[in-house]
């Protein structure tokens, strides 16, 4: 029978988690609702990460030790809001630091806000589909209202753009100046799976 274990009142979230597979499906636009679902899934799967396992998995007679099972994230998205991307990234970093590895898989398309999430996986465990298309572009926002509110909005957009660049650089082989150069053309920058490996966005092609 299927058993559901509740730890500290944390229950399996509905979509997008697959508890038995320890997999989170991040498909579609990254919205406030999607961000909340992914964060809930990360925290639930983190709570059930530690299990008894063999010290040497190849030796059935080796001592039993507590091991941390990794979490997998399947990613296929056109992107979404920066604030919800940052909420996912902050929780991913927290889980990696204190509990377990996170394996990321980019399939189909990984664009805009989805790119740092793919790159935020544990180094050596970030994979991308051979036919996956990756895309970077400048932060976008609609402005309106008085000139003062538009100036305020512009300052916020600049801050988000700088933070996006710094964050992506921290996960990859790209420097902030290299990312700014890529984005300088004011257009969408499409990247192949092979280029993503060279840039350090992912580690392996599947």
Spans of features found by a protein language model:
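Terminal-region recognition feature
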Residues: 1-206
């Amino acid at each position: 029978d299927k058993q559901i274990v509740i730890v500290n009142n944390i229950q399996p979230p509905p979509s997008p988690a697959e508890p038995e597979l320890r997999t989170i499906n991040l498909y579609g636009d990254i919205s406030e609702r999607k961000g909340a679902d992914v964060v809930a899934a990360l925290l639930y799967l983190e709570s059930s990460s530690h299990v008894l396992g063999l010290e040497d998995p190849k030796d059935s007679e080796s001592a039993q030790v507590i091991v941390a099972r990794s979490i997998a994230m399947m990613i296929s998205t056109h992107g979404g809001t920066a604030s919800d991307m940052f909420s996912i990234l902050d929780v991913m970093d927290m889980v990696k630091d204190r509990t377990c590895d996170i394996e990321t898989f980019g399939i189909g398309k990984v664009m805009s806000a989805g790119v740092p999430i793919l790159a935020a996986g544990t180094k050596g465990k970030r994979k991308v589909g051979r036919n996956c298309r990756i895309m970077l572009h400048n932060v976008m926002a609609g402005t309106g209202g008085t000139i003062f509110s538009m100036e305020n909005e512009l300052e916020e957009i600049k801050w988000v753009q700088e933070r996006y660049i710094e964050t992506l650089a921290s996960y990859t082989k790209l420097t902030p100046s290299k990312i700014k150069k890529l984005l300088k053309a004011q257009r969408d920058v499409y990247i192949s799976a092979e280029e993503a490996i060279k840039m350090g966005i992912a580690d392996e092609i599947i």
